[in-house]
């Protein structure tokens, strides 16, 4: 069976995702499409708008054959680690092709750039460190400057969010298994971070979340496939954002010692001091980010760091594993064919997982479900089985 892998968040699953999924199957001639999906919290350092099980239902209803959870210790980190670990899982499942959307739209350029960076890794790292000498330069900007020095201005614009992820997927493939082929399609109609819906049927997940959180589900439904609309209408819990977790974060920052925060993943250069000061002044999470940010720290990096503090995530990340959230008959057939040759631990029943393997994931789910009206999902990692569909 020919397998295509995709890396997703489906926060929520919308028409743009449906287009991407259909193209992934069509252009790669895949027998099975496997999605590695973020769980309770996502890469920008935010809570997912609805629980991972509801989003897995959306994926399966739309035609994904297998949904595998990207562990929270990787799903909530910067693009390098996010991509490396997603590719590690997909490689372990033996995909043939990695398919992604990008602003650039030419897979060969991603592969070329990744090969050159691997071949010139020492020089590339040196250029990054040189750019970081300026204390006001963020790591993302330093990375972009080093990339431009190596390739010039025209090969890839890695300031674009999907291009940078695509580049890191290509880099991970080159380092882990260059036999995996890459395919990409140009992202159309809506930019990744666009906050307003401006196209008849396609809008960014950011714009769709904004509508849903404002109580405009019917308006948001113009940009969602019917299966996603049904799941959202039947969902009985709250639609979530940082607003729901602000008081928990504020408490953590106020009660924790500076030394304790220094041991949290992503905390460096004294950022915990700014965060602790901001926590005593901010009225809400948006205020907190405004009070904390500097030229060196992007909003996304601050959100990720705040999330690691909320989750009490220690510097050492968990080991990778394959956690099945759901699959259809095709996905089940594929898993049964390859199960013996998969090198990572496969988790379908959490209570039977190796001790400690899912510790960070379980804690993240418990914190995610502290919000009212999520009682049905509390300890869900234990009592909600993988979704199996026909």
From Swiss-Prot:
Its EC number is 6.3.4.-. SUPFAM superfamilies: Nucleotidylyl transferase. Pfam families: HIGH_NTase1. The keyword Cytoplasm applies. Gene3D superfamilies: HUPs (3.40.50.620). It is an enzyme of class 6 (ligase). Keywords: ATP-binding, Cytoplasm, Ligase, Nucleotide-binding, RNA-binding, tRNA processing, tRNA-binding. It catalyses: cytidine(34) in elongator tRNA(Met) + acetate + ATP = N(4)-acetylcytidine(34) in elongator tRNA(Met) + AMP + diphosphate. One of its GO terms (cellular component) is cytoplasm. Coiled coil: none annotated. PANTHER family: TRNA(MET) CYTIDINE ACETATE LIGASE. Belongs to the TmcAL family. NCBIfam families: PRK13670.1. Catalyzes the formation of N(4)-acetylcytidine (ac(4)C) at the wobble position of elongator tRNA(Met), using acetate and ATP as substrates. First activates an acetate ion to form acetyladenylate (Ac-AMP) and then transfers the acetyl group to tRNA to form ac(4)C34. This is tRNA(Met) cytidine acetate ligase. It comes from Listeria monocytogenes serovar 1/2a (strain ATCC BAA-679 / EGD-e).
């Amino acid at each position: 069976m020919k397998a295509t892998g995709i890396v997703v968040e489906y926060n929520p699953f919308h028409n743009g995702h449906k287009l991407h999924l259909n193209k992934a199957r069509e252009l790669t001639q895949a027998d099975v499409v496997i999605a590695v999906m973020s769980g309770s919290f996502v890469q920008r350092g935010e809570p997912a708008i609805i629980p991972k099980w509801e989003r897995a239902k959306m994926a399966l209803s739309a035609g994904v054959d297998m949904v595998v959870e990207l562990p929270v210790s990787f799903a909530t980190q910067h693009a390098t680690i996010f991509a490396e670990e997603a590719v590690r899982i997909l490689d372990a499942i033996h995909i043939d092709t990695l398919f992604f959307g990008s602003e650039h739209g030419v897979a060969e350029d991603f592969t070329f750039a990744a090969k050159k960076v691997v071949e010139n890794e020492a020089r590339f790292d040196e250029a990054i460190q040189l750019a970081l000498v300026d204390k006001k330069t963020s790591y993302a900007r330093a990375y972009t400057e080093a990339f431009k020095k190596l390739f010039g201005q025209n090969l890839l614009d890695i300031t674009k969010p999907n291009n940078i992820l695509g580049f890191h997927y290509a880099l991970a493939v080159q380092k882990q298994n260059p036999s995996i082929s890459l395919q990409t399609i140009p992202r159309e109609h809506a930019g990744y971070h666009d906050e307003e819906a401006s196209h008849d049927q396609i809008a960014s997940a950011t714009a769709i979340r904004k509508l849903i959180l404002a109580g405009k589900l019917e308006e948001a439904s113009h940009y969602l496939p019917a299966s996603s609309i049904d799941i959202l209408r039947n969902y009985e819990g709250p639609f979530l954002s940082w607003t729901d977790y602000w008081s928990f974060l504020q408490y953590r920052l106020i009660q924790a010692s500076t030394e304790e925060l220094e041991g949290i993943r992503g905390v460096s250069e004294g950022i915990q001091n700014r965060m602790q000061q901001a926590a005593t002044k901010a009225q809400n999470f948006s205020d907190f980010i405004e009070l904390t940010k500097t030229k060196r720290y992007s909003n996304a990096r601050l959100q990720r760091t705040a999330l690691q503090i909320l989750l009490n995530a220690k510097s050492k990340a968990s080991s990778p594993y394959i956690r099945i959230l759901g699959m259809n008959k095709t996905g089940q057939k594929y898993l049964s064919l390859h199960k013996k040759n998969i090198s990572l631990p496969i988790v379908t029943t959490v209570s039977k997982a190796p001790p400690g393997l899912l510790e960070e994931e379980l804690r993240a789910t418990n914190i995610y479900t502290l919000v009212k009206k999520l009682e049905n999902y509390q300890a869900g990692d234990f009592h909600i089985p993988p979704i199996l569909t026909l």
